[in-house]
Amino acid sequence: IPVTKKVEFGPVIFQTLSHSIHPNMKKYHRQLQQTIDDIKSGELNLGESVPAGALIGKCQEQLKLNDYNLLLQFEVLDIGNLRFYIFPGELGSKFGLSMKSSTNKVAIIAGYANGFHYYFLPKEEYGLSFETIGNPVPSGEAEKIVAKLIQSGQLMDK
């Protein structure tokens, strides 16, 4: 995507979208306990970047969640040929590239906007980092959200 695109301001058009997340808490708790067991046995080691005690502590805190339901709201906002994808969390860079390449507009991803609701990384990255281990947002939810954002932008382009 060329960074030399000229921004041309024009009409303001936006869509507000939502996505509901209701994880299976029994499954989530089993995964957390398995992660704790794997850390203690040495089977899971993220190296020096994340101390084992911190990761175990994070998982133990998450085990206290008996219920987790999340209704996310996010937006696609156009001002002329400038498009903002506004999201209340951290989307993996892979998703930002997908959203930017889905439009001919100058696209900006605004993360941590209107709140922070965990990390939304590609499903293949789940369980590999501090951001996804213990995350109550199930693997694969980010892909569904990004598909909604891209589809919304494409509808706005018509």
Locate each region found by the language model.
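Non-catalytic substrate/cofactor recognition surfaces at enzyme active-site rims
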Residues: 1-158
